[in-house]
Amino acid sequence: MAGGSKIGDYVPVTALIPRRPTLVSLQEAAAHCRGCDLYVKATQTVFGEGPASARVMMVGEQPGDREDLAGKPFVGPAGRVLDEALEQAGIDRDDVYVTNVVKHFRWEGAARGKRRIHKRPRTWEIQACRAWLDAELALVQPEVLVCLGASAAQSLLGRGFSVTRQRGELVPSSLAPKVLATVHPSSILRAPDSETRHSEMRKFVADLKKVAHVLASEPKAA
């Protein structure tokens, strides 16, 4: 079904969302998602994870190879970078809900071997998946929304948003009281050498420290 040729198989996400959703019921419904063609090659839906009381929601692009196999977001190499950065920034992992704008892994096979190569999701696939993210936002109601990478930032803040120019800025939004965009942790792993990797990690942690400052300066809601 490459290229979305079997449109009749698609089911709008809005038709799957429960009338009175919880994070658990949303995850159960998302397991049957057929909103675009990505479900065909993906192992499973990878829904968001974290407490409904999370003060921070972090949104990436899509699950990777490890996440697709495990069924959990941010458990691969990029997830380990994120966990380390959160710890260095002083953010409690229990205060964080992590998810992606797209819930299925988009990939293509390598020229040789069985390796699955990440491919950036197409605009219509991101749009098809948006209702899941909107439902997550409505339930969690984070104090700070963190967009990890350009796909997440442009999906949530508009196509004109530039992470390069506006990285690390805390901006108000209808989505959350504060929104901050930064790089995706996978970009740190792609750094050409150790020195660059350490430099990019420091910048990433500095961005997350701004989030930590917001949490520290504003009392946690009861």
Functional labels for PLM-detected ranges:
Residues 2-222:
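A polyanion-binding, active-site-adjacent surface
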